[in-house]
């Protein structure tokens, strides 16, 4: 297992390098001139050219790439073109709000999604199954930005129960986490149901029932453990989805996180911040998949990696 983990970690190097190249090319193909945006609409050509020189945008593209990649290897992503602060500081100040929002959304989505999926599987083709799957399909179909605006209108504007902006208290997390986790809970419910339906028809489940084990214990002890492997896969993928999906939700709720920072950076063509954030998201996806693979072996000892 240790050798497998080490090999996967070493595989990060070429993957992140390829991502770095693609991101660098992508941001430099974006329409618009960051120097003009930073200088302002009233700036003349001389001022814009001076800003370009200060930002290093007057240098050849290959020189800019070498400067970017050589510094990135050392953990230095440069300065933000807009704030002139170190990119690492910009990301660090926004990281925790996004992380806590993602964790909060994931926790409630997994709990409610798995519960709904188990109930739907146990009472298959009956009203609990139909009700759970109807709600799940609705959760998948409803766009996050529309759900967010609806929740703001009802619970903040009309009822005045919850705040709409900020991340200072636990109340600020309720509406964004509900918005962000709704689609994940729906996917988890459908995936858990499909996995449990297969497990409930296995021979060892019938054997446990024949021995007189209660249905609740059969479902929780024998069914849950064996149905968890595909569900854990989906949990890992959905956690990555939450990190990426937070971009829309953070914009709707004016959340002070990485998603809003990325949107603002794209609007201002802040190349260093865009490159560093996408690299961070890529690293998170890779590490999440590695954690999921390790959890496989913990859930099912028959699985071994070489």
Curated annotation (Swiss-Prot):
Its main location: membrane. It is found in: Cell inner membrane. PANTHER family: DIPEPTIDE TRANSPORT SYSTEM PERMEASE PROTEIN DPPB-RELATED (PTHR43163), GLUTATHIONE TRANSPORT SYSTEM PERMEASE PROTEIN GSIC (PTHR43163:SF5). The complex is composed of two ATP-binding proteins (GsiA), two transmembrane proteins (GsiC and GsiD) and a solute-binding protein (GsiB). In the presence of glutathione, interacts with the glutathione-binding protein GsiB. Residues 95-292 form the ABC transmembrane type-1 domain. CDD domains: TM_PBP2. Residues 1-8, 124-134, 190-228, 299-306 are cytoplasmic. Residues 30-102, 156-168, 250-277 are periplasmic. Pfam families: BPD_transp_1 (PF00528), BPD_transp_1_N (PF19300). InterPro entries: BPD_transp_1_N, MetI-like, MetI-like_sf. This is Glutathione transport system permease protein GsiC. Keywords: Cell inner membrane, Cell membrane, Membrane, Transmembrane, Transmembrane helix, Transport.
């Amino acid at each position: 297992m240790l050798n497998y983990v080490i090999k996967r970690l070493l595989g990060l190097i070429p993957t992140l390098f390829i991502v770095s190249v693609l991101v660098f090319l992508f941001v430099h193909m974006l329409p618009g001139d960051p120097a003009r945006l930073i200088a302002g609409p009233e700036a003349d050509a001389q001022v814009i050219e001076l800003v370009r020189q200060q930002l290093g945008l007057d240098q050849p593209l290959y020189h800019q790439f070498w400067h970017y990649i050589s510094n990135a290897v050392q953990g230095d992503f440069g300065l933000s073109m807009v704030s002139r602060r170190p990119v690492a500081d910009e990301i660090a100040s926004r990281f925790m709000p996004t992380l806590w929002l993602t964790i909060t959304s994931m926790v409630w989505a997994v709990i409610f999604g798995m519960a709904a999926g188990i109930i739907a599987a146990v009472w298959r083709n009956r009203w609990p199954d139909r009700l759970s799957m109807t709600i799940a399909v609705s959760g998948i179909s409803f766009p996050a930005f529309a759900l967010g605006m609806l929740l703001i209108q009802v619970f903040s504007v009309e009822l005045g129960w919850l705040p709409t902006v900020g991340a200072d208290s636990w109340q600020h997390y309720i509406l964004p986490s509900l918005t962000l986790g709704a689609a994940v809970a729906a996917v988890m419910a459908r995936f858990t149901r499909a996995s449990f339906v297969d497990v409930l028809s296995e021979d060892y489940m019938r054997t446990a029932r024949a021995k007189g084990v209660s249905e609740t214990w059969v479902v929780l002890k024998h069914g849950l453990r064996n149905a968890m492997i595909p569900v854990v896969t989906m949990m890992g993928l959905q956690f990555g989805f939450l990190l990426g999906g937070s971009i829309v939700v953070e914009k709707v709720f004016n959340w002070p996180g990485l998603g809003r920072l990325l949107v603002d950076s794209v609007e201002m063509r802040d190349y260093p911040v865009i490159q560093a954030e996408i690299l961070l998201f890529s690293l998170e996806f890779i590490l999440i998949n590695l954690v999921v693979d390790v959890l496989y072996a913990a859930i099912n000892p028959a699985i071994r990696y070489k």
